[in-house]
């Protein structure tokens, strides 16, 4: 695809859409024309690839996820298509900056954190490796939310991303489907047996939009199908005329709410109901389309699992198990046993957490009225499963394994029972699943559980986010690593080359200067690019322990101000969103901002430490922050982080991990060796033993002078008229994730970080080792394992 083709497409789009030439077009017009032109290029490639797929009749995978945090698409597509240079030169002829055009595109509001970014990385890697795959999710009108910080407090506003973000989407009105909610069930005996009729339901229209997924140097173009909810009947004039104003637009209101926001707060029953509707909406629409298309092509569903692999990404799509059963039994007339055989051969499930609150459970009283037929199918699945467990002599496990227990529907259990394979996302996480969280299931289903360690789209997180480093590496070791990240290990040959180490240091400084400029421009805060950039950017949750980081900063403040400590200057950089209904997480954000304010108001302390919280964290911000990091804070309580992928992106860009032996940190430790990572804190078994013994945070306060100093000081803190006694009270009475138990070890680890950083040659050797040994964490490796070991799909070249 060359310059002439892109040029002519953009010029034609400008003429047809706006009646202008590029010479007199506005920046927005050029942006829209670029988005449309690239979309059209991908549509043509997609058509060609689809023809090849139809001829090959190869098995395809379908990745179902509540979120896909894809990030900006224009640069990614130009990079993957190999036409970024041509686009830049073409636009510069007319005094347009390609970077300015890039910056017009909003991050699509389709995800929130690591779960969604992983899904996006996998679509990228699967397409780059020419595997046929489709993603399914919801077209959220307002995304998760736009985070604004006011006086240190998080506020949530609608993220109106579609105004400028819609131009990459393809509306497919030819594939609309109906999704049903509520109503009653009627059982009717027919010649072929008992039939269930669903009556008096509310009908919602699912309208599909496709986001085309490009691959690097690949003939494949795959699709992320996004469903938007619309009222099927629309506004009811008769009800309105009778004065029933609310009822007249009830269907519109239900539909509108379904695709409004990702993860509505579920602290109320209304919020829980909406989450149930969202999950069923996109699952039902997706499966209806898939089953219909398969039946149209083959005239049977007997071979469905031979051609279709369905993947449940966390528990949100778990209803797919019951919905596929509904379609097979109710719509296509299969008997239960045959339908169950097809279903369980088709589904696989990835678990992403051992956190109890994230292993979704829905009250029967809430679920049944919303989805009466789906509930009755789940009830039957549970009945048959429990009978089978009793036959195995394992009835004592039903408390843990039953799908319905204590009037709660356990979605993780439904996913496990309805899938042929279940995997965790790091070696440690998968080990915890089989020996603890799902031990009873592992005993019932030997061989069903396995591991696929997460991976990242290295072409985005190195090639696009850090072109300075990528270009340097290409010249030094060749460009093989772009296609296959294992090739980056060639960099190990230069670990003692002082020139290379200094070159890498210079590149890191460039990225730090770029981030410093961004912080100055957006937050009006000046930071020293020669200071240590200590970075913790991830979803705000107590188990991720941003609070532990904050406690250490308070410790440094106290030591600088009162005890003569003069540390190497350090800039602590945070970015994180707290869930809208998660008050403790919001309190921690306020605490971090107050620490920053306290430091800024102290002339002595601010020479040595600075705290910056960058609001509204998203992919585009990550692409600016991660390449600039010196220190990668991965400090979750051991045993709580399933894997993490931010740790991998930071490693790839030369940051040194400061972390616990948790999630993929364990595998980073194995990859780089103990000299190139800084580990602290209790390990998983020690955490479990301490919980079992009875964790008493007061004992740590009484026995650690450092902890006592910090907590006593926080008691005296008043910033902007606010005190933080509640932080101290929480830590001394609850401290669910053992910040105090790990605090002294964390302080020592931070001292080791500073000592290593001050030895410039040693630090850059550590940095190089992290870059050079990151190959195992490519998403290419991860998706290869899914494709071969779980989905059993093959590459298809167009």
PLM region spans:
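A conserved ligand/cofactor-binding region detector
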Residues: 1-798
């Amino acid at each position: 695809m060359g310059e002439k083709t892109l040029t002519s497409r953009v010029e034609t789009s400008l003429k047809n859409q706006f009646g202008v030439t590029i010479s007199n077009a506005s920046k927005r017009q050029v942006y829209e024309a670029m988005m449309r032109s690239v979309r059209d290029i991908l549509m043509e490639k997609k058509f060609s690839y689809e023809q090849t797929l139809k001829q090959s009749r190869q098995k395809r995978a379908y990745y179902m996820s509540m979120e896909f945090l894809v990030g900006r698409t224009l640069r990614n597509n130009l990079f993957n298509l190999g036409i970024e240079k041509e686009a830049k030169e073409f636009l510069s002829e007319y005094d347009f900056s390609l970077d300015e055009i890039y910056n017009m595109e909003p991050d699509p509001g389709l995800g929130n954190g690591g779960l969604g970014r992983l899904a996006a990385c996998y679509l990228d890697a699967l397409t780059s490796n020419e595997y046929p795959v489709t993603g399914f999710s919801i077209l959220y009108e307002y995304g998760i939310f736009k985070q604004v910080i006011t006086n240190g407090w998080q506020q949530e506003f609608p993220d109106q991303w579609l105004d400028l973000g819609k131009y990459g989407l393809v509306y497919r009105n030819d594939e609309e489907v109906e999704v049903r909610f509520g109503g009653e069930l009627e059982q009717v005996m027919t010649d072929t047996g008992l039939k269930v009729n669903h009556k008096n339901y509310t009908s919602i229209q699912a309208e599909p939009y496709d986001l085309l997924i490009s691959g690097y140097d690949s003939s494949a173009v795959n699709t992320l199908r996004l469903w938007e909810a619309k009222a099927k009947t629309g506004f009811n004039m008769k009800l309105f005329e009778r004065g029933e104003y609310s009822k007249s637009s009830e269907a519109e209101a239900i539909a509108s709410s379904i695709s409004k926001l990702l993860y509505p707060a579920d602290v109320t029953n209304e919020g829980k109901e909406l989450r149930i509707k969202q999950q069923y909406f996109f699952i039902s629409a997706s499966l209806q389309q898939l089953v219909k298309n398969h039946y149209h092509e083959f005239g049977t569903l007997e071979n469905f699992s031979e051609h279709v692999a369905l993947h449940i990404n966390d528990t949100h799509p778990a209803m797919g198990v019951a919905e596929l059963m509904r379609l097979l039994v109710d719509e296509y007339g299969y008997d239960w046993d045959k339908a169950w055989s097809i279903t369980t051969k088709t589904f696989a499930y990835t678990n992403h957490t051992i956190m109890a609150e994230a292993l979704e459970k829905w009250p029967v009283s809430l679920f049944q009225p919303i989805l009466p037929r789906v509930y009755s199918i789940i009830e039957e699945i549970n009945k048959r499963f429990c009978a089978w467990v009793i036959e195995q002599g394992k009835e004592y496990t039903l408390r843990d394994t039953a799908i319905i227990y204590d009037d709660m529907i356990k979605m993780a259990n439904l996913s496990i029972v309805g899938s042929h394979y279940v995997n965790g996302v790091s070696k440690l996480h998968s080990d915890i699943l089989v020996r603890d969280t799902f031990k009873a299931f592992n005993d019932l289903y030997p061989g069903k559980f396995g591991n696929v360690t997460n991976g990242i789209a290295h072409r985005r997180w190195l090639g696009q986010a850090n072109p300075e480093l990528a270009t340097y590496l290409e010249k030094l070791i060749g460009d093989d690593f772009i296609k296959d990240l294992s090739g980056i290990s060639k960099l190990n040959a230069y670990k003692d080359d002082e020139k290379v180490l200094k070159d890498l240091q210079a590149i890191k400084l460039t990225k730090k200067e770029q981030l410093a400029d961004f912080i100055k421009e957006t937050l009006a805060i000046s930071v020293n690019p020669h200071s240590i950039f200590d970075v913790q950017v991830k979803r705000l949750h107590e188990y991720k322990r941003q609070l532990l980081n904050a406690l250490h900063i308070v410790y440094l403040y106290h030591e600088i101000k009162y005890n003569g400590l003069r540390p190497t200057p350090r800039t602590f950089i945070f970015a994180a969103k707290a869930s809208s209904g998660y008050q403790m997480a919001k309190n921690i954000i306020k605490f971090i901002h107050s620490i920053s304010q306290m430091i800024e108001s102290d002339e002595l302390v601010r020479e040595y430490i600075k705290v910056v919280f960058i609001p509204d964290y998203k992919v585009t911000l990550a692409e600016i922050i991660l390449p600039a990091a010196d220190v990668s804070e991965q400090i979750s309580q051991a045993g709580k982080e399933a894997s993490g992928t931010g740790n991998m992106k930071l490693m790839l860009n030369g940051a040194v991990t400061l972390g616990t032996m948790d999630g993929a940190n364990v595998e980073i430790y194995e990859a780089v060796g103990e000299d190139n990572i800084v580990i602290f804190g209790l390990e998983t078994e020690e955490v479990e033993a301490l919980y079992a013994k009875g964790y008493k945070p007061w004992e740590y306060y009484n026995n650690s002078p450092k902890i006592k100093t910090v907590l006593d000081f926080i008691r005296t803190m008043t910033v902007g008229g606010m005190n933080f006694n509640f932080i101290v009270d929480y830590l001394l009475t609850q401290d669910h994730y053992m910040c105090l138990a790990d605090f002294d070890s964390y302080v020592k680890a931070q001292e080791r970080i500073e000592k290593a950083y001050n030895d410039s040659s040693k630090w850059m050797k550590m940095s190089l080792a992290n870059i050079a040994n990151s190959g195992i964490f490519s998403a290419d490796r991860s998706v290869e394992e899914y494709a071969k070991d779980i989905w059993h799909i093959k590459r298809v070249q167009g």
